[in-house]
């Protein structure tokens, strides 16, 4: 495979990095969330040498991945042929904020409440490639 430069970063571009395959998500080189064959992600072998999975099996893999994400607290925003858009609230470190509130005599509690009320929603799309790997893609 050719060496990629910053200009070669198109969503869906694959790269071998630190002993496993990664894919450009639009923001970073991301690991696959799930895979039909996880061992393939750790082999430095061209993807074109593997057989492509049937569309029905890829759709089922995507459904399973979405179910797992929903169980972890995500919500489904949109489903399309391109993939499934999920949303998840940013996590708040309640233990750290609780300690800071105790150390500051309750003053930090106002900051803690403000953070909890204004936390952002992270959106991302899960899409499946022809070989059964589920990849996150940055949602706008």
Task: Map each language-model feature to its residues.
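A composition-biased, non-transmembrane "mature-region" signal
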Residues: 1-104, 109-140
